[in-house]
Curated annotation (Swiss-Prot):
Biased composition (Low complexity): 126-142
Region described as Disordered: spans on this chain: 126-159
UniProtKB keywords: Plasmid, Transposable element
Identification of the protein by name: Insertion element IS136 uncharacterized 16.9 kDa protein
Length: 159
């Protein structure tokens, strides 16, 4: 516990109270300046939906605009504008392990109708289509959870 507290830079009593559920979680973060920043951020995100908040801050600095404080950007404000059409849920008991690999935030080619093989004895799920040759699409199943093997047909994402 001491190593965790030292790493996070908080007191041990704070961590203990968090674990026991005594301390309240923080509420939503709002500042008066957010109303001025959000339209500018939204315009940038609409132009390039793959940009993250760090890249948006860097591009605004490169254009000579005043820098955007990353701490004043509310969590999820950028991600809420980016639509991801490739969400799916499976009813099989291994849905969590399957969704780790097949469902991606940016809807990569593995989620665009590619089939997935579930037959590796090492517990690997490998896609037949990789987003690129340098990044194979693999995901480990949870330890102790049986592999689906051939029990269910391969899953594909509904687009």
């Amino acid at each position: 516990m001491k190593a965790v507290a030292d790493t996070l830079g908080v007191s041990r009593s704070n961590l203990i109270e968090r674990l026991k559920g005594r301390s309240k979680p923080r509420g939503p973060y709002n500042k008066a300046e957010d109303a001025e920043l959000l339209p500018a951020i939204r315009r940038l995100v609409d132009q390039r939906p793959t940009y993250g908040y760090r890249r948006i801050a860097a591009s605004s600095i490169a254009k000579g605009e005043p820098p955007i404080s990353l701490s004043s950007t509310p969590n999820g404000s950028i991600a809420s504008w980016v639509t991801t059409p490739c969400y799916w849920r499976s009813t099989q008991p291994f849905a969590r392990a399957a969704s780790t690999m097949a469902r991606s935030w940016s809807c990569a080619p593995t989620c665009a109708g590619a089939r997935t093989a579930w037959s590796s004895p090492a517990g690997m799920a490998r896609s037949f289509v990789s987003p690129s040759s340098s990044t194979p699409s693999t995901a480990r199943s949870s330890p102790g959870r049986p592999l689906p093997m051939q029990a269910f047909p391969a899953q594909t994402c509904a687009t």
